[in-house]
């Protein structure tokens, strides 16, 4: 959130954390080398250069993640986010390789289909989304997964989480024909070190896929990020909503940063230290200015 205790205004502008988010005039910085598109929300118009307001009034881990990846890559980066709350991996996002438990239920596996369709639609319109693209070509360079709350309410889904996550990774790789696509899984972190047992079981499944002993087939291509240390309590946060990490901006920034560092390592690099961000030259270039009509349409899509 951008307002309240633990919000981005407080931690960045008043407390001075994540100083690269704020420019010398006290305004939110804009990364013109990293573009953001919410595939489930945005229409076919232009994407948004990454900033604190790319996703409207709230931020997700994409902000921290995008800064790390933008620092690493010399090329333009496009972040495609497809998110829908209160959804389970074992039901809503159920991957094809997991089969169907209820073929007559139109909602089972629907979110998986919408996710894949959303990414494909975004890539099909990339020339409209990324200014100056001009047919440059692109690589589907990685996949990030951050989810787990809904599955914890079903014993069957808890038990099946690891297998469903393995199938998800494999199926996404098949969809985009990238057999060794780097994948980063961020665990649930609800409650931090005081996490309830049901969430611990989900976390264990999420950590397992990044463990080369348990899944040697993923060695060097899949990493897991334990997010428990990024949890902030209610008195440090804008709201009492554990399922949204109490809407604490620092939590989301740290999770995104950690996911970004893990992705960079999978790509064979090393991320800049958190305290010393270095923006590429491309980041400081002026973006292509949208018309007033385009700006209005873009705001309506957020």
Regions found by a protein language model. Give the residues of each.
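Cell-envelope and extracellular/periplasmic
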Residues: 1-302
């Amino acid at each position: 959130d951008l307002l309240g205790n633990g919000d981005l205004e407080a931690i960045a502008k008043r407390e001075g954390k994540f100083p690269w988010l704020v420019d010398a005039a006290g305004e939110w910085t804009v990364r013109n080398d990293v573009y953001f598109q919410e595939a489930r929300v945005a229409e076919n118009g232009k994407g948004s250069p990454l900033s604190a307001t790319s996703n409207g009034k709230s931020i997700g881990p994409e902000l921290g993640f995008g800064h790390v990846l933008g620092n690493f890559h010399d090329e333009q980066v496009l972040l495609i986010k497809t998110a829908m709350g209160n959804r389970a991996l074992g039901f809503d996002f159920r991957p094809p390789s997991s089969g169907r438990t209820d073929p007559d239920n139109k909602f089972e596996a629907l979110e998986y289909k919408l996710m894949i369709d959303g990414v494909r639609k975004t890539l099909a319109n990339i020339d409209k989304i990324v200014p100056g693209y001009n047919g440059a070509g692109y690589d589907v360079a990685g996949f990030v997964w951050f989810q787990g709350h809904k599955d914890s309410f079903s014993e069957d889904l808890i038990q099946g989480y690891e297998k469903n996550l393995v199938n998800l990774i494999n199926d996404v790789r098949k969809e985009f024909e990238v057999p060794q696509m780097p994948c980063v899984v961020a665990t649930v972190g609800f409650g931090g070190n005081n996490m309830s047992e049901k969430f611990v079981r989900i976390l264990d499944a999420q950590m397992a896929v990044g463990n080369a002993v348990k899944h040697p087939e993923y060695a060097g291509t899949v990493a897991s990020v334990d997010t428990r240390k990024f949890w902030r309590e209610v008195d440090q946060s804008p709201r009492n909503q554990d399922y949204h990490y109490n809407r604490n901006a620092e939590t989301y920034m740290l999770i995104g940063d950690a996911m970004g560092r893990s992705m960079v390592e999978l790509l064979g690099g090393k991320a800049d230290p958190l305290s010393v961000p270095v923006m590429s030259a491309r980041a400081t270039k002026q973006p292509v200015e949208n018309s007033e009509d385009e700006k209005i349409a873009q705001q309506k899509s957020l």
